[in-house]
UniProtKB/Swiss-Prot annotation:
GO BP, one annotated term: methionyl-tRNA aminoacylation
Matches recorded under NCBIfam families: metG, PRK12267.1
Class of enzymatic activity (EC top level): ligase
Name of the coding gene: metG
Biological function: Is required not only for elongation of protein synthesis but also for the initiation of all mRNA translation through initiator tRNA(fMet) aminoacylation.
Primary residence: cytoplasm
Natural source organism: Mycobacterium leprae (strain TN)
Name under which the protein is recorded: Methionine--tRNA ligase
Transmembrane portions of the chain: none
Annotated spans, Disordered: 503-537
Basic residues bias spans: 526-537
Length: 537
């Protein structure tokens, strides 16, 4: 099988995970699952970035050892991913022993290339961004606080700290040449243009070590320095592929990575610094870096100060994991900023899932159970209406594959639901409930053909939504009598076998019932109900 290596960004475990983390994990997982179902040998890496000043300060504020806080919070991130059905192959932590070896080796390689030198640094540093800023990149607010212009985060002055620098200035032409030769290296297009513009303006050497704290990977031969967190963090992608053992089967098979999935706020680290590090170290660059957008809550940016940060686990407990996965990938054009609201989730659940998909499956399968002994019927000759619908369904895989390759999962789901919309119109226009009552053998044959055609397109839809809704799609395929070896995408072209015995039909996508408290926030109401039930227990 052809290998495919896909990664998420690794999260700082300095605080609880939020809906933005879940969004990236779900999207990346959907692609990983799609590739597996499409016959590829997938390696899926995710994890946490446990080093850096941000984590150290969070531990100090909590009054616990830094390693303890990092370990505890990393566990929270891993459990959330498991609850979201994220099918990772490895959950890496940057405190893992093999990662220390990888980080030290890439440093040695960059040093051997002459790209690391010792100097002193004075300037502004953002703990939240784990990033340095020159004076022109900051501004002083009316309240006397200085912030980074780009991110709006607080910056503090670092005074003449001894540090190692990386010769980023030497890589301007090499980076621009790579972008030009590999137009798909950065996506979406707006981020590619942003990066090219940034690099074209020239690059400055930047600090890659710290001596003012010790929570990180020590610099080889210089233990008084710890690596700048981004060298350490970015190297996790290599660690996950077996580096520094470049002769290993793992590294030979999976590196370079096919896709780094990240948020747009860290595009420079991944599309400028990371390829420069790899060029310096003599390591092949990843194939593609894609930066998704941010989620807003009812049109507002989420922040702790506003109090509108969404807990993904509360959403899952209220609406269901597959429902949340579907909403996030269907509602928002991937790569753009998007809006989250409880009302929008409920609309998708009731309109798309319960009505368009669930109701079509339930009606057709119930008719098979009631009138045909729960056995897939033998169709008679197909009419033009049957053929048109089946042709649309048959063509979905190629279209959806192209959408997933371009990280356009919303378009893939849109295409599937357009077909389901046509299937619902077909079912209504063919009126199988009337055909069923006819004593004409021709009408009975037509009845069986309509049900067969409907069940077949439901099967194809269920196959194709597996990456997004694995549990629900699995239940739908169970109802259609499909065994585990009939669920890869190769099965799309193999027609549903007449004579297949089906289990009694059950609903897969129930409608969401509004909260008992009219106008209440369903997530908060659900949380209150859970607390009430706990007290009763």
């Amino acid at each position: 099988m052809r290998p495919y290596y896909i990664t998420t960004a690794i999260a700082y475990p300095n605080a609880a995970p939020h809906i933005g983390h879940a969004y990236e994990y779900i999207a990346t997982d959907a692609i990983a699952r799609f590739k597996r179902l499409d016959g590829l040998d997938v390696r899926f890496l995710t994890g946490t970035d446990e080093h850096g000043l941000k984590v150290a300060q969070a531990a100090e504020a909590a009054g616990v050892p830094t390693a303890q806080l990092a370990r505890r919070n990393s566990g929270v991130f891993q459990r959330m991913q498991e609850a979201l059905h994220i099918s990772f192959d490895r959950f890496i932590r940057t405190t893992d022993a093999d990662h220390y070896k990888a980080a030290k080796e890439i440093w040695r390689r960059m040093d051997a290339a002459g790209d690391i030198y010792l100097g002193t640094y004075s300037g502004w540093y953002s703990v939240r961004d784990e990033r340095f800023f020159v004076d022109s990149e900051t501004k002083l607010l009316d309240n006397g606080i200085r912030v980074a212009v780009e991110t709006g985060t607080l910056v503090t002055w670092t005074e003449k700290e001894q540090t190692y620098f990386f010769r980023l200035s030497a890589y301007v032409d090499k980076l621009l040449a790579h972008y030009d030769a590999n137009p798909d290296f950065i996506g979406p297009e707006v981020r590619r243009n942003e990066v090219i513009s940034f690099v074209s303006g020239g690059l400055e050497d930047f600090s890659i070590s710290r001596t003012s704290f010790d929570w990180g990977v020590q610099v080889p031969e210089h233990p008084d320095h710890v690596m700048y967190v981004w060298i350490d963090a970015l190297t996790n992608y290599l660690t996950g592929a077996g580096f520094p053992d470049t002769d290993s089967e793992l590294f030979g098979r999976y590196w370079p990575a096919n896709l780094h999935m990240i948020g747009k706020d860290i595009i420079r680290f991944h599309a400028v610094y990371w390829p420069a590090f790899l060029m310096s170290a003599g390591i092949e660059l990843p194939r593609r870096i894609f930066a998704h957008g941010f989620l807003h809550n009812h049109g507002e940016k989420m922040s702790k100060s506003v109090g509108n940060i969404v807990d993904p686990m509360a959403l899952v407990q209220t609406f269901g994991v597959d429902q949340v996965r579907y909403f996030l990938l269907r509602e928002i054009p991937f790569g753009q900023d998007g809006n989250y609201s409880e009302e929008a989730i409920i609309t998708r659940m009731n309109t798309d899932l319960a009505n368009e998909f669930g109701n079509l499956a339930q009606r057709s399968l119930s008719m098979v159970a009631k009138n045909l002994g729960g056995v897939v019927p033998e169709p008679s000759e197909f009419t033009s209406a049957d053929t048109a619908l089946l042709t649309t369904a048959d063509g979905l895989l190629e279209r959806v594959r192209g959408n997933f390759d371009g990280q356009a999962m919303n378009l893939a789901l849109e295409a599937i639901w357009l077909m389901l919309g046509e299937a619902n119109k077909y079912f209504s226009s063919q009126q199988p409930w009337i055909l069923r009552k006819s004593e004409s053998e021709a009408d009975q044959a037509r009845f069986r053909t309509v049900l067969y055609t409907t069940c077949e397109v439901v099967r194809i839809a269920a196959l194709l939504v597996q990456p997004v809704m694995p549990e629900s799609a699995g239940k739908m395929l169970d109802l259609l009598g499909q065994e585990e070896d009939q669920r890869a995408f190769t099965a799309v072209s193999v027609r549903l076998a007449p004579g297949t015995v089906l289990p009694p039909p059950t609903g897969v996508f129930p409608r969401y019932q509004p909260s008992e408290i009219e106008g209440a926030d369903p997530v908060k109401s659900s949380s209150k109900r859970r607390e009430h039930n706990k007290r009763r227990e």
